[in-house]
Amino acid sequence: MAKNKVLGRGLADIFPEINEVYEQGLYERANRVVELGIDEVMPNPYQPRKIFSEDSLEELAQSIKEHGLLQPVLVVSENGRYHLIAGERRLRASKLAKMPTIKAIVVDIEQEKMREVALIENIQREDLNPLELARSYKELLESYQMTQEELSKIVKKSRAHVANIMRLLTLSSKVQNALLEEKITSGHAKVLVGLEEEKQELILNSIIGQKLSVRQTEDLARDFKINANFDNKKHGFKQTQTLIAEDELERFNQSLWDRYKLKAALKGKKIVLRCYKNSLLEAFMKKMMS
């Protein structure tokens, strides 16, 4: 199946087009900048970014109040109305600052290009949430039937970077929402990739509730994998010849976790405990010695 053309030119050509507007100072020309009523500008319906930091918007709104909007938004005119194609955050902050008007550059752009311009602007943002970036990558890959290798060249990132970001989309919806809401970092999220959904969400609760670091999360995920491989001979964790029944070990493990945030792993005739909070380990040791 032939690949879709990106508006007859190719996706790679769109990137320098956006940069041309902002980097070559074209917006300084009087015939390119207009002052539009804030309510005349309609949001881009194809904007892939759904969540914006309230604190960040407040800071930008205050800056706009004091210094004005330094970089105009990009809009396209259609039937007497203006549709935003780049600058969603600036538009929201200007509304928050109760500005009656907003500086804009009216560009001659086909309507179907609005989505890809929004996607590209999104990808180029430094503060973009990793999951939003993954979704933007996915939309570009699917819309234009390109490979990850081709996309990596366009966005000037390694293929490994694109692949790793895309793997975040395999996480459970609960984990994805936590990442979007910045309850966990991308480092935490990457540790959970590949785990069963139930284990992902169990570890997620621990990350949030216990404020685990990425390293602690890696240790916890490793323990879950070890416990799942108890019957694997090559790891030496076969339980059939131990004196502890599997259900007894499971109850013991659950009790340890509930009370002391400890995990127990059975290695031959030894039980190895892993601790995730020093204060609780001290409480456990005092209990054992009392």
From Swiss-Prot:
Positions of disulphide bridges: none
Methyltransferase as UniProt keyword: no
GO molecular function, one term: DNA binding
One Gene Ontology term, aspect cellular component: chromosome
Gene Ontology terms describing biological process: chromosome segregation; positive regulation of sporulation resulting in formation of a cellular spore
A Pfam family annotated for this UniProt entry: ParBc
Keywords recorded for this protein, A-Z: Chromosome partition, DNA-binding
Gene3D superfamilies to which the protein is assigned, alphabetical: 1.10.10.2830, 3.90.1530.30
Domain of life assignment: Bacteria
Record-stated family: Belongs to the ParB family.
PANTHER family tied to this protein: CHROMOSOME-PARTITIONING PROTEIN PARB-RELATED
Annotated function: Involved in chromosome partition. Localize to both poles of the predivisional cell following completion of DNA replication. Binds to the DNA origin of replication.
Name by which UniProt lists this protein: Probable chromosome-partitioning protein ParB
Taxonomic source organism: Helicobacter pylori (strain J99 / ATCC 700824)
